[in-house]
Amino acid sequence: MWKLKIAEGGSPWLRTLNNHVGRQVWEFDPKLGSPEELAEIERARETSLKVRFEKKHSSDLLMRIQFAKENPRGAVLPQVKVNETEDVTEEMVTRMLRRAISFHSTLQAHDGHWAGDYGGPMFLMPGLVITLSITGALNTVLSEEHKKEMCRYLYNHQNKDGGWGLHIEGPSTMFGTVLSYVTLRLLGEGANDGQGAIERGRKWILDHGSATAIISWGKMWLSVLGAFEWSGNNPLPPEIWLLPYMLPVHPGRMWCHCRMVYLPMSYLYGKRFVGPITPTVMSLRKELYSVPYHEIDWNQARNLCAKEXLYYPHPLVQDILWASLHKLVEPVLMRWPGKRLREKALRTVLEHIHYEDENTRYICIGPVNKVLNMLCCWVEDPNSEAFKLHLPRINDYLWIAEDGMKMQGYNGSQLWDTAFAVQAIISTNLFEEYGPTLEKAHMYIKKSQVREDCPGDLDFWYRHISKGAWPFSTADHGWPISDCTAEGLKAALLLSKIPPDVVGEPLVEERLYDAVNVILSLQNADGGFATYELTRSYPWLELINPAETFGDIVIDYNYVECTSAAIQALTSFKKSYPKHREEEVDVCIKRAAMFTEKIQASDGSWYGSWGVCFTYGTWFGVKGLVAAGKNFNDCFGIRKACDFLLSKQLPSGGWGESYLSCQNKVYSHVEGNRSHVVNTGWAMLALIEAGQAERDPTPLHRAARVLINSQMENGDFPQEEIMGVFNRNCMITYAAYRNIFPIWALGEYRCRVLQAP
């Protein structure tokens, strides 16, 4: 039976700043599990398989089964149901909230954070399996149980047409299909295994132009594997790292996720590295293409891209650039004396790879650069300490649910979910009943704050300050983020107002000041806030975005979510510490509010870049403006936002927004006009903040009825459609949102609507 282990090390090759607080790793123990538990898990798997085309999202049941045993509850209050003709009462809401918080508390790990599925993208695990296969570590790192669950996941998420999507809910793409197919083959599945599933996948690939039409990231992965030629790739010259920083195209000016992925890619491209050509690789050369491998026109393949994966088409200027580099520059750099420049560039790139590894304890900023960096360390020296330090951190990215084992989009969303959960529970004004839960969460927040900047010259390493920031996940990961810092600060300030005998001692003032310093340092010239760093270059740099399937990735753009979170955190801080950097804080809030108003769409919405989508963005937009001192009566933007949200309320009383809103940038309802508990929670929170109850509380009563009636018998909420997004086009799971936002919305509803004088 699989067991989730929290805050444990277990390897001499693991490094940590805080005794692994927040670390979540699944391990298989064949001796664990009663017959009843094993039968329950098997039923969950069978159900997941049966409904896989209708319900593509796991309900995270393996963790729930484990925690139900480890964190038993007392008697569960009776379920609440509200008829259409019945009024929602305070007693109903209070009982529902107690049921919800009691259940959510059982999902809290002993170190204080909430664990959960952060999967969704289908292109992450293939990079890991390809890297482990090349380095010969596949069978060392992955047990037979790991491989079985990875295969289960891939088979479960194959679409009806035989292909795989970019993410679990997406239509089939060449990128998703080729990489998933290759992964199954490397995991030991035969070319005709899977009850015809692999054959259907191969047919999809060949029917849609073969693997020559995979996007550039896929071309790179196939090239290092040996199932594609480097001459079929557009150039990724490592020499770009030797350019003067003053140039707008210097990678140090790019969004950190972008530069941290293209950093190791450029190393592998610069060396034209190819792994061992095994019998499986030789077979893939036949299976993936419609013509013999040696007859493929690799030069033509450079710019081929299947229409199913083409979200961001190459502009002409990019095609000219790649052709020039490919035909004129690369031949010079591959031979003496140009080769000396290449060797210098490769050394520089390796220095930056090692710096990233060491300062994230070998977790790395994300799963793509994690496995690429690991591969580069092996290419440099297969017996290196760096490669050995990478291996145990693979487990930090793996998550298992009833649909199988996946690779997550980060090493978790621990701090993010915990900060939101704290705010949700406190919003109910029932927090004294849940002191132990909040005390553990408080401990996690305190232990996860980044305590020091990265070492060395930050300008040389293209890093921003991080002392005082909060990361998205764990202190060991350590990358500072504007909105995570803001949400961490908000939660810490709320907890500081509750007696220490209930939630523990508050964070010391100096550490609050450090957090404020980080937030103030991240405001851009136009008043907005980006994610990890200041915006360092220009939007026109998107012209050289080579990733055909992602949008807006080259620079760190401003976002309404980050800007609003900063406003909220600073206004909360100002109430407790009005004299600390008073003028700077006031100016920052004012400029951020002006930016928020400026980017509002004409229909009253804000586009959400990290959640689905206009509902999410509009919640942040309204919250930010209200926190900055504006209200419905004096702010046209807030009035427009309320009109927008009310116009999207469904006949059921809820809201339900599809991920299609993100990629098409037009509001789209969930299929069948179904409501979604998370969208409904976001919309309620925005409307309550904007004073909807004072004008007409009916929409709020109707929405509250939807949330109450959605609650399950045990106090949990159903997992519905996917609610997270990144880079416009790829969806990602936030498993805790289904619990957090109904609690938060009904907590605010209880205190600010039903209990209003």
Swiss-Prot record:
GO terms for molecular function: cycloartenol synthase activity. Its EC number is 5.4.99.8. InterPro entries: SQ_cyclase_C (IPR032696), SQ_cyclase_N (IPR032697), Squalene_cyclase (IPR018333), Terpene_synthase_CS (IPR002365), Terpenoid_cyclase/PrenylTrfase (IPR008930). It holds the Pfam family SQHop_cyclase_N. The active site is at residue 483. PFTB repeats lie at residues 147-188, 512-557, 589-629, 638-679, 700-741. It is an enzyme of class 5 (isomerase). It catalyses: (S)-2,3-epoxysqualene = cycloartenol. GO terms for cellular component: lipid droplet. One of its GO terms (biological process) is tetracyclic triterpenoid biosynthetic process. Gene3D superfamilies: 1.50.10.20. Transmembrane segments: none annotated. The keyword Iron does not apply. Keywords: Isomerase, Repeat. Oxidosqualene cyclase converting oxidosqualene to cycloartenol. Belongs to the terpene cyclase/mutase family. This is Cycloartenol synthase 2. It comes from Betula platyphylla (Asian white birch). The lineage of its organism: Eukaryota, Viridiplantae, Streptophyta, Embryophyta, Tracheophyta.
